[in-house]
């Protein structure tokens, strides 16, 4: 029986996929697994019992990934599960900004007398632009970026993109190897990147200076991507005409030409259901089969569904060749291995090894000696 703790409200549609082998617990210290959305976990103490964390969403900035890896705790996310929800809001933001809708709404709320005449006289100040034929630049061509490209193309836009890791999926867009080459072409730029050391603050004065005069910038990705000081300078100078973001902060509130949304990107019933379901199924695959799929702190290890045999899972450190060393250890214990896979972290060498074995009893597996000292944690998996 596995105990699961939820740190945020998790969709009951997803939780319904937990079988009788799983129970929900209110006690974090008793949890074998944690389901989380946005709660910050960096200051949390993790019990030795905790084996996995599943983030019902894509971003994992709220989870201490390296600390989890060193403790043999696998962290999963749900890439693509909320992609359609974010895509739709990006399109909404693009249309709102292009047609000056936010400013027009604010103005219209203040109308009082002689409304018809006032509207006819004042509407011209909000004249905007159609997106048909305009060029959209997509920075980051993952699941969301690709969906945005497909939808914007269907609306008659020209699509260009930048992503150093892009592999064509038939989207029919032009991908540039250099941002400085792409940005001057774009009427609208939308960001779809993770926040990490390479991307944090990347939208700075150099980035903004490369953009087309009068362009619109959309950020439905991460707030840390944009340098607010440089952004405000670009808006005040007219270099940018509009900034739409899903991440309000104190620097941006009350500013002209900025549309702030309260982090609505994945806030749809459908996205929450999809993310929760995917997160639960990832946890089940890990606990029931030993597979690691869509982890953000360990490489993929996938043996498919468990059959009649048993599996042994190990987290190990300081092994140049985890498969070879674990094979030797299993062989010494007279455990016959049917198949074995391993995924090793480049950053610190911590690896996950999954072995399918032809035995019903692994009790003779000893953890002494040099190899045993390298094992961080282990478990048996069987039906």
Please place each PLM-identified region on the residue numbering.
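Glycine-rich Rossmann-fold phosphate-binding loop(s) that bind the pyrophosphate
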Residues: 141-142
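Short amphipathic alpha-helix segments
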Residues: 319-339
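Oxidoreductase and adenylate-handling cofactor-binding alpha/beta cores
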Residues: 87-106, 152-157, 278-291, 327-331
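N-terminal Rossmann-fold NAD(P) dinucleotide-binding loop
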Residues: 145-146
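Rossmann-like dinucleotide-binding domain for NAD(H)/NADP(H)
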Residues: 158, 213-311, 315-317, 328-329, ...
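Rossmann-like adenosine-cofactor binding region
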Residues: 39-44, 160, 164-252, 267
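Phosphate-binding beta-alpha-beta segment of Rossmann-like dinucleotide-binding domains, i.e.
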Residues: 79-135, 294-295
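An N-terminal-biased, well-structured beta-alpha scaffold segment characteristic
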Residues: 1-78, 184, 204-209, 340, ...
């Amino acid at each position: 029986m596995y105990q699961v703790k939820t740190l945020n409200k998790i969709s009951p549609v997803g939780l319904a996929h937990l079988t009788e082998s799983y129970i929900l617990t209110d006690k974090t210290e008793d949890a074998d697994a944690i389901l989380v959305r946005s709660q910050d976990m960096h200051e949390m103490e993790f019990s030795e019992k905790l084996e996995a964390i599943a983030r019902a969403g894509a971003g994992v900035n709220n989870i201490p990934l390296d600390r989890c890896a060193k403790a043999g705790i696998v962290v999963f996310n749900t890439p693509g599960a909320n992609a359609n929800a974010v895509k739709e809001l990006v399109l909404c933001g693009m249309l709102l900004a292009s047609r000056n809708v936010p400013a027009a709404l604010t103005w219209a709320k203040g109308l009082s007398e002689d409304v018809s005449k006032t509207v006819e006289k004042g509407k011209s100040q909000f004249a905007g632009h159609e997106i048909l034929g305009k060029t959209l630049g997509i920075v980051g061509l993952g699941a969301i970026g690709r969906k945005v490209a497909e939808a914007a193309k269907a609306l008659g836009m020209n699509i260009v993109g930048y992503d150093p890791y892009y592999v064509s999926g038939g989207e029919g867009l032009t991908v540039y190897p250099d941002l400085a080459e792409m940005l001057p072409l774009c009427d609208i730029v939308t960001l779809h990147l993770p926040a990490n050391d390479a991307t944090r603050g990347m939208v700075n004065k150099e980035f903004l200076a490369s953009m087309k005069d009068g362009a619109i910038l959309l950020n439905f990705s991460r707030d840390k991507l944009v340098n607010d000081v440089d952004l405000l300078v670009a808006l005040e100078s007219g270099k940018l005409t509009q900034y739409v973001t899903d991440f309000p902060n104190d620097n941006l509130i009350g500013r002209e030409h900025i549309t702030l949304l309260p982090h609505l990107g994945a806030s749809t019933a459908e996205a929450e259901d999809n993310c929760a379901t995917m997160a639960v199924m990832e946890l089940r695959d890990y606990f029931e089969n030993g597979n690691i799929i869509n982890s953000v702190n360990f490489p993929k290890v996938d043996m498919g569904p468990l059959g009649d045999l048993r599996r042994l899972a190990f987290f190990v450190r300081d092994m140049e060749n985890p498969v070879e060393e674990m094979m030797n250890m299993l062989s010494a214990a007279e455990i016959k291995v049917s198949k074995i896979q391993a995924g090793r972290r480049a950053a610190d060498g911590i690896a996950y090894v999954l072995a399918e074995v032809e035995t019903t009893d692994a009790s003779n597996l000893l953890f002494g000696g040099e190899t045993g000292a390298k094992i961080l944690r282990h478990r048996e998996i069987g039906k």
